[in-house]
Amino acid sequence: MCRFFATAPKGLNELLREELTTFGAENIKTQPTGATFDGDLEVGYRSCLWSRLANRIYLVLLETELPNQEALSSVVQSIDWSKHIDKEGTFAVSFSGQGLGITHSHYGALKIKDGIVDYFREHYQVRPSIDTEVPDIRVHGHLNRNQLTLSLDLSGYSLHQRGYREGIQVEAPLKENVAAAILMRANWPEIAQQGGAFYDPMCGSGTFLVEAALMASDTAPGVAKSGEMLLNYWLGHDESLWQKLVEEAEQREQVGLKHLPNIYGSDISHKSLDVARNSIQAAGYDDVIEIKQMAVEQGRKWGDWSPGLIVCNPPYGERLGEEETVKQIYLKLGEYLKAEFIHWKAAILTCHTELGMFLGIKAKRSHDFFNGAMSCRLFRFEIEEEWFRQPALQPKQDLAEQVLQLQPDLADTDNAKMVSNRIRKNMKGLKSWVKQNDISAYRVYDADIPEYALAIDLYDTLESGLWVVVAEYAPPKTVNPTKAKRRLYEAMSVLPSVFNVSPERIVFKVRSQQKGQDQYERLDEQKAFFTIVENQTRLRVNFTDYLDTGIFLDHRQVRQEVAKLAAGKRLLNLFCYTATATAEAVKAGCKSSLSLDMSKTYLYWAKHNFMCNDINEKQHVLQQENVLEWLETATQNPKDLFDVIFLDPPSFSTSKRMDGTLDIQRDHVDLIQKTLKLLSKDGKLIFSTNLRKFKLDKASFEPDYQIENITQRTMPKDYARNMKIHQAWLFSRQ
């Protein structure tokens, strides 16, 4: 078994993991710069031949910890280099990272080179030559503080260099492996297999076209340069295995070419098309890929095209004064797509997310990408009328995007500026508190100006940074609906600039009193989950699929209280929702736990919260139960008692799996009394409710229990403007 490291462009880690799995890789661990994985030599060879995403595949020779810089030479010399490098051959060394006083890559490479040379001089009295341009072998060293990794570069060149663009100068090219990743995200392999066509209406140098053909024909991207890879000069090379894999790849390509779907490209620039023709010819697809000079606004399909996939990378408009020109390009592209490509899929890459609005089609999904150092966004579309943006503003999740497109001047009005100033003032007041407490999700505005009745929450996610969730409190019937809408749009218009976030990451929701099943109503099917950190616990949130996000932010300190009490104890979490309180308690040292909820959806969500924190589900159990029925049974002859119980029931609930209803004001005495039967001798129960007019019947529990109102101490600073958001009590046996 060998250890390998695959480098890849930033942001492709998860796609790379999926790809490496298809090669037979095991123990894959992604990093910002790529992924380590285990496998036999065949897995490494397949990665060199078939990876469409990796830059380089390294065979790891040594991983060790260095006590000091001086130890580097002896560690390098401890490797039997005669198994890897011909003593009469040539080699080169590259180096990355820093540590132990090594801060320059050239110096690190020089130290490793000297160690290899000294090894050969000591054992063979001869040494291989250094050739930094075309060596037989490339050795790579990486130092992370005191952790040294020495590897062989199996290809010797970046695998994104397929060979079809060599010698071709392209302005601001999209790397081949980034283009391949975009095609993967857009599901091109599946579409091609079903016979769908491919079209790039702004094909430029033709990178998408060639990569689409390579994928659709099942061509290994490394096969054309298989003879140039440095693994051919490695002394540990298995020539027969390599030739077998190369022949297999060539056979697969021959079969794949027979089933290649139609691939088309067009561009307004004849110079770009000349470059594209050269690339297409070099790749061997000049009889397969059809290109044509044509502006988007002149666009018409020129043949019988089966519905398939459109992918393009429109101009970014980086130069001063180009913004309006680029906006017009997006408008025309959107008109072209809607007029000619109904029932197709599309994927558009842009580094200015607001430009996507001008296509006039709502994106179904989006993904972060990097074109070099430039942060970009890939928008994926289904070109169906139901996804076309309507000219009138609609109170939907993408309301901020709509306002930006249809009422771009609204943010300059006096009322909008007033809302902006209030939010900025709130943010300034919370800034030090957020930083001191390492808070990544919090409320920044809660109807501070009564006429602008919104709740605005910020979520700083690990995956993609800041998201803004805006909930509107449904206005009373006495309020003029037109005026209420106007105020809503004014508030939404300033949010992108206030939070310095693209409107696509501002999610709007309408709040109203929830009844019965409404509280669990699914709003969408995007299934886009993100991760935040609270009290050193990773928690999964979802901004689009439900009215709620998976975490109640006002309960932040309630969860902290539960976690503190449960350290080293047994915890019962009733109506656990997504079990955020349990996850935080386990991170704080909870010995064992049982978390119950009736919703399969939320328990599945809770399971992912547990997975994010490596929580043992045998020790910490998630169980789907009608909590009221479970309590009825569990309290008849209680055997399992708990040291800490967290009881946070809904204010009102009905369900298909539940007979009758739960009304917390009416039923709280019976519910709490049953729950207390499961409390150990010195146990504690925290009861919490969000019912604003709730009154606790303390007399029903005294004098057997000491009851402490902990509402004020569990109310976080970001909810100080709304002290009725929840109430909480701590029950202790007298």
From Swiss-Prot:
Annotated S-S bridges: none
Molecular-function GO term, any one: RNA binding
TM segment ranges: none
Location of the THUMP domain: 43-154
Keywords attached to this entry: Cytoplasm, Methyltransferase, RNA-binding, rRNA processing, S-adenosyl-L-methionine, Transferase
Entries under Pfam families matching the protein: Methyltrans_SAM (PF10672), RlmL_1st (PF22020), THUMP (PF02926), UPF0020 (PF01170)
Subcellular location: Cytoplasm
Keyword S-adenosyl-L-methionine: yes
HAMAP family documented for this protein: 23SrRNA_methyltr_KL (MF_01858)
NCBIfam families recorded: PRK11783.1
Family, per entry: Belongs to the methyltransferase superfamily. RlmKL family.
Classification via PANTHER family: RIBOSOMAL RNA LARGE SUBUNIT METHYLTRANSFERASE K/L, RIBOSOMAL RNA LARGE SUBUNIT METHYLTRANSFERASE K_L
Name of the molecule in the record: Ribosomal RNA large subunit methyltransferase K/L
Source species: Hydrogenovibrio crunogenus (strain DSM 25203 / XCL-2)
Gene that this polypeptide is encoded by: rlmL
